[in-house]
């Protein structure tokens, strides 16, 4: 099966078969990351620009490693070191970058929809590395890959997502992807951090009580409190938040015995989850980071026109 999209803007745009293709390719590419020499010539001669308007550690580093393991050339541009600080618009930045003939632009931007705007104005491929509160497709894919490795499937899983849903592009990508793959998503968080109508995105249940969301869950995914996006009225204190929506060993016992604990990072330890849980046997947080490289290799591979056998 060939991947038919020029860009990857969000999981909302992808079919179940396309998501499976990206996950299966990532699973195949993981083997490269275990070799002594972690490089294949698949994207030799391709140029990838990582254009980040927001701070990032895991995503930007992971995309750069993914590109280099496929032998692509990478250029990293951050807003703080670019002409953006001089007032250059996204449109002008895009046209100037495009004039240098890149093959793929990987972009993170604070404004939801920025990637749609960019993709309409450039001829090269665009991959969304996070746009506002809209989507973070690579995170959603790596989360699903991590779950599938543990349970062998996504269909029928109960996945609890707890935290700041309003500002979370990770939550939205997981909702789109997981519900398309047959999982049931349960959401919990403070009422001020739960957007109205979120349940209309798929097979989603909104719970007022965190306990209801995580009871008998296969996966408990905790989200970071995005302090940089909070208004004064959304979060009284971190202590109060942790009291009602923080995960500890006692609460984790409500989930299934073999439940996974996940977090997209960075973690606010002692707020959304305690260190005992973050570093415990049920934590798959570092496995998520590990899988991120393979997933982003898969995304780069497929928007470059790669095709794998269906079997």
Curated annotation (Swiss-Prot):
Keywords, alphabetical: Pyrimidine biosynthesis, Transferase
One Gene Ontology cellular component: cytosol
Residues involved in carbamoyl phosphate binding: 58-59, 108, 136, 139, 265-266
Gene Ontology MF terms: amino acid binding; aspartate carbamoyltransferase activity
GO BP field: 'de novo' pyrimidine nucleobase biosynthetic process; 'de novo' UMP biosynthetic process; amino acid metabolic process
Coiled-coil ranges per UniProt: none
Keyword Transferase tagged: yes
Segments traversing the membrane: none
Binding site for L-aspartate: 86, 169, 224
UniProt-listed Enzyme Commission number(s): 2.1.3.2
Catalytic activity: carbamoyl phosphate + L-aspartate = N-carbamoyl-L-aspartate + phosphate + H(+)
Pathway of action: Pyrimidine metabolism; UMP biosynthesis via de novo pathway; (S)-dihydroorotate from bicarbonate: step 2/3
Transferase among keywords: yes
Biological function: Catalyzes the condensation of carbamoyl phosphate and aspartate to form carbamoyl aspartate and inorganic phosphate, the committed step in the de novo pyrimidine nucleotide biosynthesis pathway.
HAMAP family in alphabetical order: Asp_carb_tr
Subunit structure: Heterododecamer (2C3:3R2) of six catalytic PyrB chains organized as two trimers (C3), and six regulatory PyrI chains organized as three dimers (R2).
Family the UniProt entry places it in: Belongs to the aspartate/ornithine carbamoyltransferase superfamily. ATCase family.
Annotated protein name in UniProt: Aspartate carbamoyltransferase catalytic subunit
Source organism (scientific name): Geotalea uraniireducens (strain Rf4)
Gene encoding the protein: pyrB
């Amino acid at each position: 099966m060939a991947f038919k999209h020029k860009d990857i803007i969000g999981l909302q745009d992808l079919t179940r078969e396309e998501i499976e293709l990206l996950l299966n390719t990532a699973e195949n590419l993981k083997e490269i990351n275990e070799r002594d020499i972690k490089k294949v010539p698949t994207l030799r001669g391709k140029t990838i620009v990582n254009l980040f308007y927001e701070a990032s550690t895991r995503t930007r580093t992971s995309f750069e490693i993914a590109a280099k393991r496929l032998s692509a050339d990478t250029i990293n541009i951050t807003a703080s070191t670019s002409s953006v600080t001089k007032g250059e618009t996204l449109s002008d930045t895009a046209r100037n970058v495009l004039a240098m003939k890149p093959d793929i632009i990987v972009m993170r931007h604070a404004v939801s929809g920025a990637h749609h705007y960019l993709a309409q104005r450039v001829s090269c491929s665009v991959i969304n590395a996070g746009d506002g509160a809209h989507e973070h497709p690579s995170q959603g894919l790596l989360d699903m890959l991590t779950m599938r490795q543990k349970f062998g499937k996504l269909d029928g899983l109960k996945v609890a997502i707890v935290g700041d849903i309003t500002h979370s592009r990770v939550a939205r990508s997981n909702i789109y992807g997981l519900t398309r793959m047959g999982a049931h998503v349960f959401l919990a968080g403070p009422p001020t951090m739960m957007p109205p109508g979120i349940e209309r995105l798929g097979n989603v249940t909104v719970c007022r009580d965190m306990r209801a969301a995580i009871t008998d869950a296969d996966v408990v995914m905790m989200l970071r409190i995005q302090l940089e996006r909070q208004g004064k009225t959304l979060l009284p204190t971190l202590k109060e938040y942790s009291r009602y929506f923080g995960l500890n060993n006692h609460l984790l016992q409500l989930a299934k015995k073999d439940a996974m604990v996940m977090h997209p990072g960075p973690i606010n330890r002692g707020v959304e989850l305690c260190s005992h849980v973050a570093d415990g046997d049920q934590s798959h947080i570092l496995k998520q980071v590990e899988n991120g490289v393979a997933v982003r290799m898969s995304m780069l591979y497929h928007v470059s026109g790669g095709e794998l056998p269906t079997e």
